[in-house]
């Protein structure tokens, strides 16, 4: 079982994953804060909505049941980080990765180091995450238009549990950020926040 040290008084929090390689792991720090506030307002989940980040090499990684990773550029995990992230995920931790455009090749390369024999699988629209709280019958929303490719969602499973969820060409976390950051419409932002709520509810329900 995953030991949630930091979830005092039953509160749920998210930690942004800090990684090496040059990618902007830190972009849009308002994203998680806004998502967690939305979750608290629309579900019975009690949250700690502070912005928090953690390095893979830190013992603090095991204090968070949910890690969030995003960015535009390169990602590099050291051998020690690969082992620690694998241990975290195998012991019940959950990682959500949102490609903010330009992250795909690096994410796939580095996650293959973590799970060499466990590849990303594209999730069908019938998968439970897409209807666990709000209904997304066509899968991930297209929040931020980078090009004309369809939004897609991928997963890595450990003993039938979704341990890693990865959105590509979707970018819902842009819709979580403060409205002035990306100028997404109110409708797009609400859709993105609802989708993020589904991810959290699904991660907690497994």
Please place each PLM-identified region on the residue numbering.
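Surface-exposed patches in mature extracellular/periplasmic domains of secreted proteins
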Residues: 45-55, 97-100, 118-126
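Loop/turn elements at helix/coil->beta-strand transitions in domains of secreted/extracellular proteins
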Residues: 10-12, 62-66, 90-94, 118, ...
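Bacterial N-terminal signal peptides
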Residues: 1-3
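Short alpha-beta junction capping motif
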Residues: 14, 66-105
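Aromatic-Pro/Gly-enriched surface loop or interdomain linker
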Residues: 6-66, 70-73, 171-172, 178-206
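An acidic, glycine-rich "communication" segment
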Residues: 21-22, 30-31, 104-180, 188-197
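Alpha-helical scaffolding within the catalytic cores
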Residues: 49-56, 78-84, 148-152
């Amino acid at each position: 079982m995953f030991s949630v040290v930091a979830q005092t008084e039953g509160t749920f929090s998210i930690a942004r994953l800090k990684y090496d390689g040059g990618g902007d792991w830190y972009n849009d720090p308002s994203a998680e804060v806004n998502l967690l506030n939305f979750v608290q307002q629309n579900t019975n989940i009690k949250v700690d909505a502070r912005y928090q980040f953690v390095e893979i090499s830190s013992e603090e990684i095991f204090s968070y049941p949910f890690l969030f990773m995003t960015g535009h550029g390169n990602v590099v995990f050291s051998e020690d980080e690969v082992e620690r992230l694998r241990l975290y995920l195998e012991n019940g931790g959950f990682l959500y990765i949102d490609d903010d455009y330009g992250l795909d090749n690096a994410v796939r390369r580095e996650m293959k180091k973590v799970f060499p024999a466990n590849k990303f699988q594209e999730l069908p629209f019938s998968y439970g995450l897409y209807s666990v709280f709000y209904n997304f019958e066509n899968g991930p929303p297209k929040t931020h238009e980078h090009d004309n490719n369809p939004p897609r969602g991928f997963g890595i499973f450990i003993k039938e549990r979704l341990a890693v969820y990865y959105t590509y060409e979707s970018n819902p976390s842009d819709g979580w950020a403060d409205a002035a950051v990306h100028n997404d419409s109110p409708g797009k932002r609400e859709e993105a926040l609802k989708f993020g709520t589904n991810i959290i509810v699904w991660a907690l329900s497994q």
